[in-house]
Amino acid sequence: MPKHSPPDTSPVARFEQSLQELEQLVQNMETGALSLEQSLGAYERGIALYRECHQALEQAQLRVRILSDPMRPDDGEPFDPSIVSTSQ
């Protein structure tokens, strides 16, 4: 029986999904059809999604820098997302 690797749940892997959900929230809020309570909930969710997307972009940028470092051309270490600061 083949082993299935668990799905990647890193921010980089979830970036597209988070961005799509954020764009949908913005569209819903721009229509003006949401109540105040719904708008606040959507805003809270939007902030969380924005932070996830921002973290994913930071990780991707760091990953590119590590891979592009001319001082370490033979460095074959896998990227460790825990080295990226998650504090905002």
UniProtKB/Swiss-Prot annotation:
Molecular function per GO: exodeoxyribonuclease VII activity
Designated name of the protein: Exodeoxyribonuclease 7 small subunit
Pfam family name, one: Exonuc_VII_S
NCBIfam families reported in the protein's UniProt record: PRK00977.1-4, xseB
Family: Belongs to the XseB family.
Protein keywords: Cytoplasm, Exonuclease, Hydrolase, Nuclease
Subcellular location: Cytoplasm
Top enzyme category: hydrolase
Quaternary structure, from the entry: Heterooligomer composed of large and small subunits.
Coiled-coil positions: none
HAMAP family associated with the record: Exonuc_7_S
Function: Bidirectionally degrades single-stranded DNA into large acid-insoluble oligonucleotides, which are then degraded further into small acid-soluble oligonucleotides.
UniProt GO cellular component terms: cytosol; exodeoxyribonuclease VII complex
Ranges for region Disordered: 69-88
PANTHER family: EXODEOXYRIBONUCLEASE 7 SMALL SUBUNIT (PTHR34137:SF1)
Single GO BP term: DNA catabolic process
